[in-house]
Regions:
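Solvent-exposed beta-hairpin/edge-strand motifs
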Residues: 47-87, 141-165, 217, 260, ...
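Early extracytoplasmic/domain-onset interaction patches
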Residues: 10-54, 134, 205-271
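Solvent-exposed loop and beta-edge segments used for protein-protein assembly and interaction
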Residues: 16, 28-34, 43-46, 57, ...
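A surface-exposed beta-strand-loop module
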Residues: 60-65, 69-137, 172-206, 281-282, ...
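Intrinsically disordered, low-complexity linkers and stems that provide flexible hinges
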Residues: 22-25, 132-245, 350-415
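Hydrophobic h-region of N-terminal signal peptides that target proteins for export
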Residues: 1-11
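Beta-strand elements of well-folded, non-transmembrane domains
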Residues: 28-32, 38-46, 55, 106-108, ...
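Intrinsic-disorder/low-complexity, polar/charged segments enriched in Ser/Thr/Lys/Arg/Asp/Glu/Gln
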Residues: 21, 33-37, 46-50, 99, ...
Length: 415
Protein backbone atom coordinates (compact mmCIF):
# COMPACT_ATOMS: atom_id res chain seq x y z
CA UNK A 1 0.00 0.00 0.00
CA UNK A 2 2.80 2.40 0.91
CA UNK A 3 4.58 1.68 -2.36
CA UNK A 4 1.37 2.24 -4.32
CA UNK A 5 0.79 5.53 -2.52
CA UNK A 6 4.31 6.72 -3.24
CA UNK A 7 3.97 5.72 -6.89
CA UNK A 8 0.70 7.62 -7.23
CA UNK A 9 2.26 10.64 -5.56
CA UNK A 10 5.24 10.52 -7.90
CA UNK A 11 2.92 10.33 -10.92
CA UNK A 12 0.78 13.29 -9.82
CA UNK A 13 1.45 16.56 -11.66
CA UNK A 14 3.21 19.28 -9.70
CA UNK A 15 1.87 22.81 -9.41
CA UNK A 16 3.30 24.87 -12.25
CA UNK A 17 2.99 28.58 -12.95
CA UNK A 18 4.08 31.35 -15.32
CA UNK A 19 4.09 35.11 -15.93
CA UNK A 20 4.64 36.16 -12.31
CA UNK A 21 4.58 39.92 -11.67
CA UNK A 22 4.51 41.75 -8.35
CA UNK A 23 3.68 45.34 -7.45
CA UNK A 24 4.71 46.50 -3.97
CA UNK A 25 3.16 49.68 -2.57
CA UNK A 26 5.09 50.87 0.50
CA UNK A 27 2.75 52.18 3.20
CA UNK A 28 3.75 54.73 5.84
CA UNK A 29 7.13 53.77 7.35
CA UNK A 30 5.67 53.70 10.85
CA UNK A 31 3.68 50.62 9.79
CA UNK A 32 6.66 48.63 8.43
CA UNK A 33 4.06 47.35 5.96
CA UNK A 34 3.58 47.16 2.21
CA UNK A 35 0.67 46.17 0.02
CA UNK A 36 1.32 43.51 -2.61
CA UNK A 37 -0.49 42.90 -5.90
CA UNK A 38 0.73 39.54 -7.18
CA UNK A 39 -0.27 38.51 -10.70
CA UNK A 40 0.33 34.83 -11.37
CA UNK A 41 -0.83 32.24 -13.88
CA UNK A 42 -1.58 28.63 -12.92
CA UNK A 43 -0.56 26.30 -15.76
CA UNK A 44 -1.15 22.76 -14.45
CA UNK A 45 -3.80 21.31 -16.76
CA UNK A 46 -6.94 20.36 -14.83
CA UNK A 47 -5.92 22.20 -11.66
CA UNK A 48 -8.80 23.67 -9.65
CA UNK A 49 -6.66 25.28 -6.93
CA UNK A 50 -3.52 27.38 -6.70
CA UNK A 51 -1.28 27.64 -3.62
CA UNK A 52 0.66 30.81 -2.87
CA UNK A 53 3.27 30.54 -0.08
CA UNK A 54 3.28 33.18 2.66
CA UNK A 55 6.89 34.29 3.01
CA UNK A 56 8.60 33.31 6.25
CA UNK A 57 9.20 36.30 8.53
CA UNK A 58 6.26 38.26 7.11
CA UNK A 59 2.84 38.71 8.69
CA UNK A 60 0.06 38.71 6.09
CA UNK A 61 -3.28 40.51 6.39
CA UNK A 62 -6.08 41.96 4.25
CA UNK A 63 -5.87 39.16 1.70
CA UNK A 64 -8.10 39.10 -1.37
CA UNK A 65 -7.94 37.12 -4.60
CA UNK A 66 -9.45 37.90 -8.01
CA UNK A 67 -9.90 36.05 -11.29
CA UNK A 68 -8.00 38.13 -13.84
CA UNK A 69 -10.30 37.18 -16.72
CA UNK A 70 -13.58 38.22 -15.09
CA UNK A 71 -12.36 40.57 -12.36
CA UNK A 72 -14.54 38.70 -9.85
CA UNK A 73 -13.37 37.69 -6.35
CA UNK A 74 -12.27 34.11 -5.79
CA UNK A 75 -12.70 32.05 -2.62
CA UNK A 76 -9.53 31.27 -0.69
CA UNK A 77 -8.27 30.12 2.68
CA UNK A 78 -4.95 30.09 4.52
CA UNK A 79 -3.70 26.53 5.11
CA UNK A 80 -0.63 24.96 6.67
CA UNK A 81 2.03 23.15 4.72
CA UNK A 82 0.69 19.86 6.04
CA UNK A 83 -2.79 20.69 4.77
CA UNK A 84 -1.42 21.79 1.39
CA UNK A 85 0.31 18.43 1.00
CA UNK A 86 -3.07 16.74 0.96
CA UNK A 87 -3.31 17.99 -2.62
CA UNK A 88 -1.10 15.73 -4.79
CA UNK A 89 0.11 18.82 -6.68
CA UNK A 90 1.67 20.10 -3.45
CA UNK A 91 3.43 16.96 -2.23
CA UNK A 92 6.54 19.06 -1.54
CA UNK A 93 4.83 21.82 0.46
CA UNK A 94 6.98 22.99 3.36
CA UNK A 95 6.00 22.56 7.01
CA UNK A 96 7.66 25.91 7.73
CA UNK A 97 5.22 27.85 5.54
CA UNK A 98 1.54 28.64 5.37
CA UNK A 99 -0.17 28.91 1.98
CA UNK A 100 -3.02 30.90 0.48
CA UNK A 101 -5.16 28.19 -1.15
CA UNK A 102 -7.15 29.74 -4.00
CA UNK A 103 -10.13 28.08 -5.68
CA UNK A 104 -9.82 28.89 -9.38
CA UNK A 105 -12.79 30.19 -11.36
CA UNK A 106 -12.51 27.25 -13.76
CA UNK A 107 -10.20 24.25 -14.20
CA UNK A 108 -7.03 25.12 -16.07
CA UNK A 109 -7.55 24.03 -19.71
CA UNK A 110 -5.15 21.65 -21.42
CA UNK A 111 -2.30 23.87 -22.65
CA UNK A 112 -4.16 26.80 -21.07
CA UNK A 113 -3.87 29.10 -18.11
CA UNK A 114 -5.68 30.21 -14.97
CA UNK A 115 -4.81 33.86 -14.30
CA UNK A 116 -5.30 35.26 -10.81
CA UNK A 117 -4.41 38.38 -8.83
CA UNK A 118 -3.56 37.97 -5.14
CA UNK A 119 -3.74 41.10 -2.99
CA UNK A 120 -2.26 41.10 0.50
CA UNK A 121 -0.50 43.32 3.00
CA UNK A 122 2.76 42.22 4.60
CA UNK A 123 4.31 43.58 7.77
CA UNK A 124 8.04 42.92 7.85
CA UNK A 125 10.20 45.13 10.05
CA UNK A 126 13.39 43.57 8.70
CA UNK A 127 12.55 44.38 5.07
CA UNK A 128 10.99 47.83 5.47
CA UNK A 129 12.41 50.19 8.08
CA UNK A 130 13.50 53.70 8.84
CA UNK A 131 17.07 54.58 7.89
CA UNK A 132 19.07 54.71 11.14
CA UNK A 133 21.46 57.22 9.54
CA UNK A 134 18.80 59.57 8.17
CA UNK A 135 15.80 60.69 10.25
CA UNK A 136 13.84 61.40 7.05
CA UNK A 137 14.95 58.26 5.25
CA UNK A 138 13.52 54.78 4.68
CA UNK A 139 15.04 51.53 3.46
CA UNK A 140 13.35 48.71 1.56
CA UNK A 141 15.78 45.79 1.64
CA UNK A 142 14.16 42.67 0.25
CA UNK A 143 15.56 39.99 -2.06
CA UNK A 144 12.92 39.41 -4.74
CA UNK A 145 12.60 35.98 -6.34
CA UNK A 146 9.91 37.07 -8.80
CA UNK A 147 11.56 38.23 -12.01
CA UNK A 148 9.25 41.17 -12.86
CA UNK A 149 8.60 43.73 -10.13
CA UNK A 150 7.49 47.25 -9.37
CA UNK A 151 7.98 49.03 -6.03
CA UNK A 152 6.06 52.24 -5.31
CA UNK A 153 7.37 54.64 -2.66
CA UNK A 154 5.01 56.25 -0.12
CA UNK A 155 3.64 59.71 -0.98
CA UNK A 156 6.16 62.49 -0.41
CA UNK A 157 9.29 60.37 -0.80
CA UNK A 158 12.06 60.79 -3.36
CA UNK A 159 14.22 57.89 -4.53
CA UNK A 160 17.81 58.28 -3.32
CA UNK A 161 19.22 54.83 -3.95
CA UNK A 162 18.45 51.68 -5.98
CA UNK A 163 21.01 48.93 -6.47
CA UNK A 164 19.18 47.02 -9.22
CA UNK A 165 19.02 48.67 -12.68
CA UNK A 166 15.43 49.85 -12.93
CA UNK A 167 13.06 52.17 -14.68
CA UNK A 168 11.91 55.09 -12.56
CA UNK A 169 8.28 55.98 -13.22
CA UNK A 170 6.06 58.72 -11.84
CA UNK A 171 2.63 57.40 -10.88
CA UNK A 172 -0.49 59.42 -11.79
CA UNK A 173 -0.90 60.44 -8.12
CA UNK A 174 2.70 61.66 -7.88
CA UNK A 175 4.27 58.74 -6.07
CA UNK A 176 7.56 57.47 -7.48
CA UNK A 177 8.02 53.84 -8.54
CA UNK A 178 10.89 51.69 -9.72
CA UNK A 179 10.32 48.80 -12.10
CA UNK A 180 12.72 46.14 -13.27
CA UNK A 181 13.05 42.74 -14.90
CA UNK A 182 15.56 40.30 -13.42
CA UNK A 183 16.45 37.80 -16.13
CA UNK A 184 19.17 35.92 -14.27
CA UNK A 185 18.85 33.01 -11.86
CA UNK A 186 18.37 33.53 -8.14
CA UNK A 187 16.91 36.50 -6.35
CA UNK A 188 17.36 40.17 -7.20
CA UNK A 189 19.03 41.64 -4.06
CA UNK A 190 16.97 44.83 -4.10
CA UNK A 191 17.88 47.66 -1.71
CA UNK A 192 15.96 50.93 -2.03
CA UNK A 193 16.70 54.16 -0.18
CA UNK A 194 14.23 57.05 -0.14
CA UNK A 195 13.84 60.33 1.72
CA UNK A 196 10.77 62.36 2.68
CA UNK A 197 11.71 65.39 0.60
CA UNK A 198 9.12 65.25 -2.21
CA UNK A 199 5.80 67.12 -2.43
CA UNK A 200 2.44 65.41 -2.11
CA UNK A 201 -1.01 65.98 -3.58
CA UNK A 202 -1.49 68.11 -6.69
CA UNK A 203 2.04 69.50 -6.43
CA UNK A 204 3.41 66.01 -6.98
CA UNK A 205 1.24 64.98 -9.94
CA UNK A 206 3.23 64.62 -13.19
CA UNK A 207 2.30 66.30 -16.44
CA UNK A 208 0.40 64.05 -18.85
CA UNK A 209 2.63 62.10 -21.20
CA UNK A 210 2.64 63.28 -24.79
CA UNK A 211 3.13 61.89 -28.27
CA UNK A 212 6.32 63.89 -28.79
CA UNK A 213 9.28 61.94 -30.15
CA UNK A 214 12.91 62.16 -29.15
CA UNK A 215 15.07 64.52 -31.19
CA UNK A 216 17.79 61.84 -31.15
CA UNK A 217 15.89 59.48 -33.45
CA UNK A 218 14.58 60.12 -36.98
CA UNK A 219 11.28 61.94 -36.61
CA UNK A 220 9.09 59.12 -37.92
CA UNK A 221 10.94 56.27 -36.22
CA UNK A 222 11.64 57.31 -32.63
CA UNK A 223 9.30 56.06 -29.89
CA UNK A 224 6.82 58.45 -28.33
CA UNK A 225 7.25 59.80 -24.81
CA UNK A 226 4.26 57.66 -23.80
CA UNK A 227 5.96 54.52 -25.11
CA UNK A 228 9.31 55.40 -23.55
CA UNK A 229 7.75 55.90 -20.09
CA UNK A 230 5.46 52.87 -20.10
CA UNK A 231 6.29 50.13 -17.62
CA UNK A 232 8.31 47.41 -19.36
CA UNK A 233 8.10 44.82 -16.56
CA UNK A 234 4.28 44.76 -16.68
CA UNK A 235 3.98 44.44 -20.46
CA UNK A 236 2.28 41.11 -20.95
CA UNK A 237 3.14 40.09 -24.50
CA UNK A 238 5.82 37.42 -24.78
CA UNK A 239 6.92 35.65 -27.95
CA UNK A 240 8.60 32.29 -28.56
CA UNK A 241 10.17 31.55 -31.96
CA UNK A 242 10.69 27.93 -33.07
CA UNK A 243 13.23 27.78 -35.89
CA UNK A 244 12.64 25.15 -38.56
CA UNK A 245 15.36 23.84 -40.90
CA UNK A 246 17.30 26.94 -42.03
CA UNK A 247 17.08 25.90 -45.69
CA UNK A 248 13.33 26.50 -45.42
CA UNK A 249 13.73 30.10 -44.17
CA UNK A 250 10.72 29.27 -41.96
CA UNK A 251 10.01 29.61 -38.26
CA UNK A 252 6.84 29.15 -36.29
CA UNK A 253 6.01 31.27 -33.28
CA UNK A 254 3.40 31.92 -30.68
CA UNK A 255 2.78 35.08 -28.77
CA UNK A 256 0.61 35.46 -25.70
CA UNK A 257 -1.32 38.69 -25.36
CA UNK A 258 -3.81 40.06 -22.83
CA UNK A 259 -6.60 42.39 -23.96
CA UNK A 260 -8.36 44.43 -21.27
CA UNK A 261 -9.61 47.42 -23.27
CA UNK A 262 -13.41 47.57 -22.92
CA UNK A 263 -15.07 46.92 -26.26
CA UNK A 264 -11.98 45.42 -27.92
CA UNK A 265 -13.09 42.55 -30.13
CA UNK A 266 -10.27 41.67 -32.52
CA UNK A 267 -6.51 41.35 -32.77
CA UNK A 268 -4.60 42.55 -35.83
CA UNK A 269 -1.02 41.54 -36.61
CA UNK A 270 0.53 43.39 -39.54
CA UNK A 271 3.09 41.13 -41.23
CA UNK A 272 6.58 42.60 -41.52
CA UNK A 273 7.87 43.53 -44.95
CA UNK A 274 9.97 40.70 -46.37
CA UNK A 275 8.01 37.99 -44.56
CA UNK A 276 5.10 35.81 -45.58
CA UNK A 277 2.70 34.27 -43.08
CA UNK A 278 0.79 30.99 -43.05
CA UNK A 279 -1.19 28.72 -40.73
CA UNK A 280 -2.44 31.34 -38.27
CA UNK A 281 -4.42 30.02 -35.30
CA UNK A 282 -5.49 31.28 -31.89
CA UNK A 283 -7.27 30.29 -28.73
CA UNK A 284 -8.25 31.80 -25.38
CA UNK A 285 -5.72 30.69 -22.79
CA UNK A 286 -8.20 31.24 -19.95
CA UNK A 287 -10.80 28.78 -21.29
CA UNK A 288 -9.23 26.84 -24.16
CA UNK A 289 -11.82 28.25 -26.60
CA UNK A 290 -10.61 28.10 -30.22
CA UNK A 291 -10.84 31.31 -32.25
CA UNK A 292 -11.11 31.86 -35.99
CA UNK A 293 -8.03 33.35 -37.64
CA UNK A 294 -7.62 34.58 -41.20
CA UNK A 295 -5.19 36.55 -43.32
CA UNK A 296 -6.52 39.67 -45.07
CA UNK A 297 -4.79 42.34 -47.13
CA UNK A 298 -4.95 46.02 -46.38
CA UNK A 299 -7.26 46.43 -49.37
CA UNK A 300 -9.63 43.76 -48.05
CA UNK A 301 -9.68 45.42 -44.62
CA UNK A 302 -10.50 48.76 -46.21
CA UNK A 303 -13.29 47.23 -48.30
CA UNK A 304 -14.75 45.63 -45.17
CA UNK A 305 -14.41 48.96 -43.33
CA UNK A 306 -12.18 47.34 -40.70
CA UNK A 307 -9.68 49.64 -38.97
CA UNK A 308 -6.63 47.71 -37.70
CA UNK A 309 -5.42 50.71 -35.71
CA UNK A 310 -2.51 51.64 -37.97
CA UNK A 311 -1.81 52.50 -41.58
CA UNK A 312 -1.57 49.38 -43.75
CA UNK A 313 -0.56 49.15 -47.41
CA UNK A 314 -3.13 47.76 -49.85
CA UNK A 315 -1.14 44.56 -50.45
CA UNK A 316 0.21 44.15 -46.92
CA UNK A 317 -1.07 40.97 -45.24
CA UNK A 318 -2.67 41.25 -41.81
CA UNK A 319 -3.58 38.37 -39.49
CA UNK A 320 -7.10 39.05 -38.15
CA UNK A 321 -8.45 37.27 -35.06
CA UNK A 322 -11.93 38.26 -33.81
CA UNK A 323 -13.05 37.45 -30.27
CA UNK A 324 -16.06 38.34 -28.09
CA UNK A 325 -16.00 42.02 -27.01
CA UNK A 326 -14.20 42.61 -23.72
CA UNK A 327 -16.53 43.85 -20.99
CA UNK A 328 -15.46 46.59 -18.59
CA UNK A 329 -13.46 45.20 -15.69
CA UNK A 330 -12.61 41.95 -17.49
CA UNK A 331 -9.79 40.74 -19.72
CA UNK A 332 -8.95 37.91 -22.08
CA UNK A 333 -5.56 36.32 -22.76
CA UNK A 334 -4.91 34.92 -26.22
CA UNK A 335 -2.28 32.60 -27.64
CA UNK A 336 -1.66 33.36 -31.31
CA UNK A 337 0.39 30.98 -33.46
CA UNK A 338 1.77 31.64 -36.94
CA UNK A 339 4.43 30.39 -39.32
CA UNK A 340 6.65 32.90 -41.13
CA UNK A 341 8.95 32.53 -44.10
CA UNK A 342 11.59 35.28 -44.16
CA UNK A 343 14.71 34.63 -46.29
CA UNK A 344 16.41 37.86 -45.20
CA UNK A 345 15.86 37.09 -41.52
CA UNK A 346 16.49 33.34 -41.40
CA UNK A 347 18.81 31.40 -43.67
CA UNK A 348 21.64 28.92 -44.12
CA UNK A 349 24.88 30.72 -44.94
CA UNK A 350 28.29 29.05 -45.33
CA UNK A 351 27.07 26.03 -43.42
CA UNK A 352 25.82 28.16 -40.53
CA UNK A 353 22.30 28.79 -39.32
CA UNK A 354 21.74 32.57 -39.24
CA UNK A 355 18.76 34.20 -37.49
CA UNK A 356 18.79 38.00 -37.71
CA UNK A 357 15.73 39.77 -36.32
CA UNK A 358 14.79 42.85 -34.32
CA UNK A 359 12.72 42.29 -31.16
CA UNK A 360 10.61 45.10 -29.74
CA UNK A 361 8.89 43.27 -26.87
CA UNK A 362 10.47 42.94 -23.42
CA UNK A 363 10.37 39.12 -23.40
CA UNK A 364 11.39 37.00 -26.39
CA UNK A 365 12.69 33.47 -26.77
CA UNK A 366 14.23 31.55 -29.67
CA UNK A 367 14.40 27.74 -29.89
CA UNK A 368 16.99 26.30 -32.26
CA UNK A 369 16.02 23.38 -34.50
CA UNK A 370 16.96 19.88 -33.36
CA UNK A 371 20.50 18.89 -34.22
CA UNK A 372 22.03 22.38 -34.04
CA UNK A 373 24.30 23.91 -31.38
CA UNK A 374 24.63 27.59 -30.54
CA UNK A 375 27.81 29.40 -31.59
CA UNK A 376 26.91 33.09 -31.45
CA UNK A 377 24.36 35.46 -29.91
CA UNK A 378 24.90 39.18 -30.36
CA UNK A 379 22.58 40.10 -27.48
CA UNK A 380 23.03 38.67 -23.95
CA UNK A 381 20.58 35.84 -23.28
CA UNK A 382 19.97 33.10 -20.79
CA UNK A 383 20.45 29.71 -22.42
CA UNK A 384 19.05 26.33 -21.46
CA UNK A 385 18.56 22.90 -22.95
CA UNK A 386 14.99 21.70 -23.36
CA UNK A 387 14.01 18.12 -22.45
CA UNK A 388 14.11 17.14 -26.13
CA UNK A 389 17.68 18.42 -26.51
CA UNK A 390 16.93 21.65 -28.39
CA UNK A 391 18.55 24.87 -27.19
CA UNK A 392 16.43 27.81 -26.04
CA UNK A 393 17.64 31.40 -25.70
CA UNK A 394 15.64 33.90 -23.63
CA UNK A 395 16.06 37.62 -24.24
CA UNK A 396 14.74 40.02 -21.60
CA UNK A 397 15.03 43.64 -22.65
CA UNK A 398 14.16 46.12 -19.90
CA UNK A 399 15.00 49.13 -22.09
CA UNK A 400 12.31 50.96 -24.11
CA UNK A 401 13.94 50.13 -27.45
CA UNK A 402 14.45 47.28 -29.88
CA UNK A 403 17.25 44.74 -29.66
CA UNK A 404 18.80 43.55 -32.92
CA UNK A 405 19.35 39.86 -32.30
CA UNK A 406 21.85 37.93 -34.41
CA UNK A 407 22.10 34.21 -33.68
CA UNK A 408 24.36 31.69 -35.36
CA UNK A 409 24.46 27.93 -34.92
CA UNK A 410 26.11 24.91 -36.46
CA UNK A 411 25.06 21.31 -36.91
CA UNK A 412 25.92 18.91 -34.11
CA UNK A 413 28.22 16.00 -34.76
CA UNK A 414 26.21 12.82 -35.43
CA UNK A 415 26.19 10.40 -32.52
Amino acid sequence: MLAAGLAAQAAAPRQTEADAYTRYELLGPETASFKIYYEITATTAGATHYYNPIRAGSTASDEAVYDAMSGKPLPFEVVTGAAARQDPMMARASDSMDYIKVTLARPVPEEGQGRIIIVKTYKDEKSYLRDPRDPKGIIFNRPLGIQRNEVVLPPGYELTGCNVPSQVLAQPDGRVAISFMHAGSGEAPLILHARADAPTGDAARPAALTGERSWEAPARQGPTERARLSERAHQDRDIVYFLEAPESHAFSLYHDYTEAQPGAHAYYNVVREGSTVSSPSAYVLDTGEKLNAQVMTGAQLAAAKINPGESVGASTPVVVIPFPPVAKGTSVRLRISETYTAPASYRLENGELVFDRSFGRPRNAVVLPAGWYLTDSSIPATVRELPDGRIRLDFWNDRPDNIDVLIKARRKQPN
